[in-house]
Amino acid sequence: DSVYVGGSMFGARAYANNFSEEELLEAIDYVHLHGKKLFMTVNTLLKEQELEEKLYAYLLPYYKRGLDAVIVQDVGVLRFVRKHFPDLPIHASTQMTITGIDGAKFMEEQGVQRVVTSRELSMKEVQQIAEHTNVEIESFVHGALCYCYSGQCLFSSFLGGRSGNRGQCAQ
């Protein structure tokens, strides 16, 4: 019932054919026309200069068009979005490495609507988080499984000079 997309910046799939601004705005309209939701990724680590000079202008057109949620990794981005777009729902990315109840509760306290749990968790661990928090829970059940904990990668950078934390995973 929802579509997940990456835009032209700050997504963990830097080498993918991501949406341009025009395409993403059209996608928001199209998805809403069919009664569905669109969630956009901002799931990399941002530098201070990027937060101050780029993130607001990047998110603003999508926010105005009715973006349903932003998926974030960086707690600085979470704080920034909460401050500048207070009614925009935020989802904590699997890249945020939420591995337990306390992490999920902390995200809940920060106003996060949904936690995408770490891919490395068992079904029982995910169930425990769901039973002890009030946030929506989402989990990956297939796909890539990183050598490191998701969102904590230094391996790609070490081996290939490409930062997985900036969307350039060597996987």
List the model feature ranges, each with a label:
Residues G100-D102:
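Conserved nucleotide-cofactor-binding alpha/beta core module
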Residues D1-I98, V116-E120, E125-Q171:
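Active-site pocket-lining/capping segments in soluble small-molecule metabolic enzymes
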Residues G111-V112:
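As written
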